[in-house]
Amino acid sequence: MNHGRRSILVKSVTAAGWMTFGLETFAHERTGTSSNAMRLISIGGALTEIVYLLKANTQLVGVDATSIYPTAATRLPNVGYARSLSAEGILALRPTQLIATEDAGPPIALRQIGDAGIPVSMLPSGHQFIDVINRVRTIGRLVHKTDAAEVLASRLLLEWSSTQKRVANSKINNTRVLFILSQNPSQLMVGGEKTSAAAMIAYAGARNAITRVSGFKPLTPESVIAANPDVIVLTDQGMKAVGGISGVLRFPGVKQTRAGKEQNIISLEAMYLLGFGPRMPLAVAELNLLLQHAMA
């Protein structure tokens, strides 16, 4: 990046494709980088999964802490959590390209990486299926795997069509679902509207039990009881952290809900459930199936 007053160009991806706009942050995109020479760092488990599916993983020299699938990604140098990146640690890996979702940071770290002349491509972290397809195609262009990206996009579109048919036939549209984010038994954090959890619940054919708040917010016992979810969903990591189903039932108010009384409590791995990566159609189908079983 130019650290002076000059406006530079950053590539942003929208549903319509590439769009450039002026900012005084991040790096300009360098041209002429060959795929063989690329040293790629991927910030975001969903992005890393796409890189592997495009068979561009030989270009990877580092990933973030959420890049746990496939297992091979965990053997790469880890640059930490997406929201607390260290420019020094990233630059030590001598990358020639960094990809990340727009919620990565802090901005100063990304600015420092850009100042060092490293292209930084920020991808929208939207929670719609089309966002998954857009990320596949964008990464395909960045790693010079456009043909493979189109093959993958076509496969995902077929999987998505199949999932949508399954959801439409499942008849769980009145099922009220509460997503608990908490990994701390002393505080109940839930997924309100405009969250990845709310999007997955809706895609799976059910209703979010929390509709009056947006984002991930703490919830009082009275609000939990009033929400009265039919099913409670957690990540596998969250379920383990609170001590399993018995731990979930210890959250104030949960025992008084239908989900608590009937122990309709399910979990899925965090990135699989909330990452909106290439496994998203399968995750929606599995969540739908688990909800059907819980309500049977």
Outline where the language-model segments fall.
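Short secondary-structure boundary segments
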Residues: 44, 102-103, 125, 213, ...
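A short, structured surface patch at a secondary-structure boundary
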Residues: 39-93, 97-107, 245
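A ligand-binding cleft/hinge motif common to bilobed small-molecule-binding domains
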Residues: 104-115, 233-249
